[in-house]
Amino acid sequence: MASSQVGDMVNGNAEPTRHLAKFPPSLWGDRFTSFTLDKQLSDKYGNEIEVLKEQVRSMVVAGGRKAVEQINLINVLERLGVSYHFEKEIEEQLEQLFAKFEDNEDYDLFTIALHFRIFRQHGYKMSCDVFNKFRDSNGEFKETVSNDVQGMLSLYEATYLKIRGEGFLDEAHAFTIAQLESLVGGPHLSSDLSEQVMHALKQSIHRGFPRLEAKHFISFYEKDASRNETLLRLAKLDFNQLQLSHREELCHIFRWWKELDLISKVPYARDRAVECFFWSTCAYYEPQHSVGRAVLTKIMLLLSVTDDTYDAYGTYDEVKLYTNAVQRWDVSAMDELPDYMKALYRALLNVYDEVERDLAKQGRAYGVHHSKEAFKEIVRSYEIEAEWFKEGYVVSFEEYMKNALVTSTGRLHTTSCFMGLEADVATTEAFEWILTKPKMVATSGAIGRLVDDVMSHDEEQERGHVATGLDCYMKQHGVSKQEAIVELYKMIENAWRDINEEMLKPTAISMKLLIRVLNLSRISDVVYKYVDGYTHPEIIKDHVISLFEDPIPM
């Protein structure tokens, strides 16, 4: 947190010393300022999509198909990114398939692992004992497994659905990674299969950004000799049509952000309108959630600037004033703020008023109160961190995490995300569930907080920053930075296990809500996997271009 070394002067003439972050500027210039939707092309795509959807729907519900064929069809639909059109039909099929599933000795590793992954993704708790037949009397994997590349790849993907206490899946994860890495680029893999393996090792299905992973899979599927041309055509059309819609939405958001002109008044902050929309599109990409994407993006942008204000510019006295103003949530509180904070505070109040008006038209404004309260909670926790930095405190890891579970934004992002869902899904009970501090939301926030602490540690400490979870763990346990990183990654993996378990039936709330929390967790894996891709947007630039600019060749 930024502190004053000269003196915490809010309205005096002397400018206090500030620990400026010097964040990289926006990458995009005016690139997304204008976009004209090709209505004729969009309508053409839409008409053909409707015809193909009915053909595929008939395939999904058709009787007489073997269970293996049905699970393979569902897998292809999901990986192509078109399963959202057939949610009801797929759930009905999976319920029947799970009830009738038998561990048939004829099923190979690929098929067993595929069943395991698909069932668990949909909340069905298939036991990992189904993999026992692939181990010898010593508990080691049989030699035949090492020769089955597709089987190992399927098992590798399945291991990401593990929960606590499933040591076998930990062993399988390490085993398949080692085996697959040894095969990449070797003579035993075709170039296409080698490319699939390399991508899987870089980004798993379960933790990936659904729309990006769909685009990758489409490129693999069209080279598959056994491909279904109807499915492939639907996937390409669907991706391109949604891309047109997302691009138009991004243009509206980008222009709104430019017209708000907040960054010119707070130039110390990260300018990340495009990246926030990218984030929101991961939370929900489906066409019916356009309002939700806009709402979530705007709130994320305001939170990002607020975070940078506490983290990389504001003095302790200044941020205390801002915290108090946010708690009051009243325009009269602006009078007590320094000029640069007035612009941010005005934007905060105006955006929430705008969001409330838009959602009121659809009878969904009840969630706005919950989002405001979550925002208030976060700035209180930001102030706690500012005090720690001012006093030079390195608190215990447990105390750090208690506060970090708030600053990780899990509650705010989940609440704001729910505001964009249909009223019959995001009910008042759904928002009340968030208030109970459920494990699903807490662990989602913990993943984001811990991986960010690891990836941004060196840069933040160089400029002056409150002690992160990494620092607190190192001091408390007397370990090296590398040893602390290992332990934090163990915590991250356990958090993923908890998320997986929370999504097994019976669930606390609708799976339609839980999948949004899962998607918010996935963002951390994609954006912070190797470096802080939000602070350094060039890291995810190719993802943004792939998602919003580059169509799939038809």
From Swiss-Prot:
Q: Which GO terms describe its biological process?
A: diterpenoid biosynthetic process; sesquiterpenoid biosynthetic process
Q: Which domain of life is it from?
A: Eukaryota
Signal peptide start and end residues:
none
- Name of the featured protein: Valerianol synthase TPS1G
Cofactor info, note text? Binds 3 Mg(2+) ions per subunit.
Upper classification of the organism = Eukaryota, Viridiplantae, Streptophyta, Embryophyta, Tracheophyta
Family to which this protein belongs: Belongs to the terpene synthase family.
Q: Which GO terms describe its molecular function?
A: carbon-oxygen lyase activity, acting on phosphates; magnesium ion binding; terpene synthase activity
Q: Does the keyword Metal-binding apply?
A: yes
What the entry says about domains is:
The Asp-Asp-Xaa-Xaa-Asp/Glu (DDXXD/E) motif is important for the catalytic activity, presumably through binding to Mg(2+).
Q: Which Pfam families match?
A: Terpene_synth, Terpene_synth_C
Q: From the UniProt record, report the name of the gene that encodes this protein.
A: TPS1G
Question: What sections of the protein cross the membrane?
Answer: none
In which residues is Mg(2+) 1 bound? D307, D311
Q: Which cofactor does it need?
A: Mg(2+)
| Entry keyword Transferase | no
Q: What are the EC numbers? A: 4.2.3.204
Q: What does this protein do?
A: Terpene synthase that catalyzes the biosynthesis of the terpene valerianol, which is a volatile compound of floral scent.
| Keywords of this entry | Lyase, Magnesium, Metal-binding
Which reaction is the catalytic activity of this chain? (2E,6E)-farnesyl diphosphate + H2O = valerianol + diphosphate
| UniProt source species | Camellia hiemalis
Q: Where along the chain is Mg(2+) 2 bound?
A: D307, D311
Motif DDXXD motif, per the record, lies over 326-330
